[in-house]
């Protein structure tokens, strides 16, 4: 009886131990399995970033910029120089000495250092894209890769109107280029990752979503068609990459809306399709050679849509067609509403302007036009701009800063000054808005293209015969 009890006790003990061991093993197996599953479903950007980071560069700039300080107290400046009310029209003081006083001081160059970011888009050629404002006025450009390698770089081309610049790393090899997406396929709500070099801290990553597309009216750049994101973009991120979760470039970080200088979750990037078009021209020509449609217009609001009898507020309203422009020759008319470009919907005049602003001369495209209750497709070939801006590195420096257009004066083909930027060579020579250029060096120049060719010959001196109001004057540049 005792033997039976002892044997039974041993059996119970063995079963208990086996059961406990089995439960422990199950727990271990279960915990291990849960750990594996947890790692599998835990989201991480690390694998994607490992591929992308080698293509993002930090940029260090050494440069110099011209600054001006006033010789005169601020309250006295309006009474001296050409802009004085006493020096206008038929004023008896027009030729007095105080009308020829320059209230500004002489130009003064100041050195500066700056930081930014960029993205390698062609590993074989060493091409990287960044913002124009990052490399503007740069005398020396040095870039650093994610692995610590450093290279000197040079500017291939830049465009202030879109804030895009293309640089080339010198004597660089074993580079990694980023894959570029199609920004036309972006949607509000898509995840974004911003990579850059904020505050010189080295490569930093932030994430967010696309908050809006086609943002404009920010007075940041000339051509505005921004991607808006809430991914933090801070100082130094300019020129850096905005990528999707596949690690593909969707935009170039360019600006933030920051009243106090910090990030409030509103950042802007230039769409990569625009970047591709502009940098391709920079590679080919060293600059952007834009075609121009040749229209003036406005956004299509509800009141205008009602008057034009269209059941939509999306499109670009054409208020004027410039003579001899691409639009004029294609048959576009004032009052037309452009609703598509190459079958792609156009949401606003700003978006149309931005789309066309990245296209080169001779580009053929199809515009969808709403006219008198019907939609009409019109083929247009972009021509050279009707209005020419000679403020380019490749133009003669003596006349930089002036906007010119072809003009008819007394039945003679001449050139009209549309605008003069302050503190530029053109303003120092004495050009003023609405001046009419009758001849240059006693040679009749009938249009802007002829003038550009003449300036490219780099004459030792330039003598401009100018009609200004009722006066005929001469402006000289040596």
From Swiss-Prot:
InterPro entries: PDZ, PDZ_sf, Pept_S1C_Do, Peptidase_S1_PA, Peptidase_S1C. It comes from the Bacteria. Residues 1-26 form the signal peptide. Its EC number is 3.4.21.-. The active site is at residues 133, 163, 238. One of its GO terms (biological process) is proteolysis. The keyword Nucleotidyltransferase does not apply. CDD domains: cpPDZ1_DegP-like (cd10839). It is an enzyme of class 3 (hydrolase). Residues 281-372, 387-469 form the PDZ domain. The keyword Metal-binding does not apply. Gene3D superfamilies: 2.30.42.10, 2.40.10.120. Keywords: Disulfide bond, Hydrolase, Protease, Repeat, Serine protease, Signal. Disulfide bonds join 87-99. Residues 116-254 are annotated as: Serine protease. GO terms for molecular function: serine-type endopeptidase activity. Belongs to the peptidase S1C family. PANTHER family: SERINE PROTEASE FAMILY S1C HTRA-RELATED, SERINE PROTEASE HTRA2, MITOCHONDRIAL. NCBIfam families: degP_htrA_DO (TIGR02037), PRK10942.1 (NF008189). This is Probable serine protease do-like.
């Amino acid at each position: 009886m005792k033997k039976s009890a002892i044997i039974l006790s041993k059996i119970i003990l063995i079963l208990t131990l086996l059961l406990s061991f089995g439960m422990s093993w199950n727990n271990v197996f279960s915990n291990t399995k849960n750990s594996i599953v947890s790692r599998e479903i835990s989201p991480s950007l690390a694998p994607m970033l490992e591929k992308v980071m080698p293509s993002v560069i930090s940029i260090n700039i050494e440069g110099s910029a011209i600054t001006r300080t006033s010789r005169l107290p601020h309250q006295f400046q309006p009474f001296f120089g050409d802009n004085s009310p006493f020096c206008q029209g038929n004023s008896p003081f027009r030729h007095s000495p105080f009308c020829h006083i320059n209230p500004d001081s002489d130009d003064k160059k100041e050195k500066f250092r700056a930081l930014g970011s960029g993205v390698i888009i062609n590993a074989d050629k060493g091409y990287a894209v960044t913002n124009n404002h990052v490399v503007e006025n740069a005398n020396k450009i040095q870039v650093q890769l994610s692995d610590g390698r450093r290279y000197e770089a040079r500017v291939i081309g830049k465009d202030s109107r879109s804030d895009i610049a293309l640089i080339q790393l010198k004597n660089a090899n074993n580079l990694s280029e980023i894959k570029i997406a199609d920004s036309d396929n972006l949607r509000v709500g898509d995840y974004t990752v911003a990579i850059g070099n904020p505050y010189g801290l080295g490569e930093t990553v932030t994430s967010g979503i696309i908050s809006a597309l086609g943002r404009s009216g920010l007075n940041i750049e000339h051509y505005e068609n921004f991607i808006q994101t809430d991914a933090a973009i801070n100082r130094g991120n300019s020129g850096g990459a905005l990528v999707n979760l596949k690690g593909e470039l969707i935009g170039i970080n360019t600006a933030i809306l920051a009243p106090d200088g910090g990030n409030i979750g509103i950042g802007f990037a230039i769409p990569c399709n625009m970047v591709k078009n502009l940098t391709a021209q920079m590679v080919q020509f060293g600059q952007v050679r834009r075609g121009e449609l040749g229209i003036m217009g406005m956004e299509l609001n509800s009141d205008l849509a009602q008057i034009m009898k269209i059941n939509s507020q999306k499109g670009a309203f054409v208020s004027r067609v410039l003579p001899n422009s691409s639009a004029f020759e294609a048959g576009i008319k004032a009052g037309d509403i452009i609703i598509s470009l190459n079958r792609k919907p156009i949401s606003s005049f700003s978006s149309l302007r931005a789309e066309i602003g990245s296209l080169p001369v001779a580009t053929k495209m199809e515009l969808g036009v709403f006219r008198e209750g019907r939609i009409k497709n019109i083929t247009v070939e972009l021509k050279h701009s009707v209005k020419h801006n000679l403020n380019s590195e490749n133009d003669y420096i003596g006349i930089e800063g002036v906007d010119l257009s072809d003009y008819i004066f007394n039945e003679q083909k001449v050139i009209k000054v549309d605008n003069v930027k302050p503190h530029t060579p053109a303003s120092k020579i004495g050009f003023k808005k609405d001046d009419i250029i009758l001849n240059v060096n006693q040679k009749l120049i009938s249009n802007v293209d002829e003038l550009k060719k003449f300036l490219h010959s780099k004459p030792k001196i330039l003598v401009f015969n100018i009609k200004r109001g009722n006066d005929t004057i001469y402006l000289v540049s040596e």
